[in-house]
């Protein structure tokens, strides 16, 4: 009635509700709505540091079923969502991301007091450093191209966390589109032929990322000497495609 064509809802999966996403997905298809998924994470801003999927087999099994359903759909968006959900399985298993995190370059987060962070998933036990505060600069470009912002981007490149959230996954899925596409094409064909989708051999794509990123070490992030290069902004304020 309001003329909104792209509308939907999502489900953040924890230990107790993974089975719900299967019927919620089916309901979304019946209603002609979009359906998105996430898995719970820890963050200073989420006020949580003990979120952990403990019944991994059950949760991964339900994500597997969802992936197979998504690949049966006629929409390419659903096929790429299947890839995104494979990334959630990979995250739950505690592995480094399939594609690198480029938070602080492809996206950013402004907290209520004006500090700009690369994302909202930072934790003190790993690292948490601001790129600057919007109240202390005359323009956003001054902050975005500052040495402090570049320093934080360096910390992102060696960040121990293996988060897989839409805000940081979607931009790199688009940037390195050939890698998700290769998985999508292969597994869409398997789905059309009635073959099972394998989730045990999760691809990890080397696009030049630092091997330290996402290794879940709970220690100080190593500081590397960096050369500051001027760059064009690649800012994504919101992401609704997944």
At which residue positions do the language-model features occur?
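Short cysteine/histidine-rich metal-coordination sites, predominantly Zn2+-binding motifs
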Residues: 176-187
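Radical SAM enzyme [4Fe-4S]-AdoMet core and its adjacent flexible, acidic
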Residues: 1-117, 121-132, 172, 176, ...
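Short Fe-S-cluster ligation motifs
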Residues: 151-160, 188-218
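Alpha-helix boundary/capping detector
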Residues: 54, 185, 189-190
């Amino acid at each position: 009635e309001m003329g909104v064509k792209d509308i939907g809802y999502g489900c953040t999966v924890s230990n107790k509700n993974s089975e719900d996403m299967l019927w919620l997905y089916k309901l979304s298809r019946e209603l002609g709505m979009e359906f998105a998924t996430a898995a719970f994470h820890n963050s200073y801003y989420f006020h949580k540091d003990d979120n952990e999927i403990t019944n991994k087999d059950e949760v991964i099994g339900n994500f597997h079923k969802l992936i197979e359903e998504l690949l049966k759909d006629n929409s390419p968006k659903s096929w790429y969502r299947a890839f995104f959900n494979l990334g959630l399985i990979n995250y739950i298993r505690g592995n480094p991301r399939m594609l690198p995190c480029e938070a602080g370059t492809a996206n950013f987060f402004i907290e209520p007091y004006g500090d700009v962070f690369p994302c909202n998933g930072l934790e003190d036990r790993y690292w948490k450093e601001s790129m600057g505060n919007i109240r202390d600069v005359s323009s956003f470009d001054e902050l975005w191209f500052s040495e402090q912002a570049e320093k934080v981007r360096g910390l992102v490149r060696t960040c121990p966390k293996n988060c897989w959230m839409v805000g940081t996954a979607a931009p790199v899925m688009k940037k390195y589109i050939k890698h998700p596409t290769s998985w999508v094409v292969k597994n869409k064909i398997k789905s059309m032929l009635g073959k099972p989708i394998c989730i045990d051999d999760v691809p990890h794509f080397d696009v030049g990322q630092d091997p330290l990123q996402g290794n879940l070490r709970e220690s100080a992030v190593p500081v590397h000497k960096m050369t500051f290069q001027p760059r064009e902004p690649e800012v994504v304020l919101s992401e609704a495609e997944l």
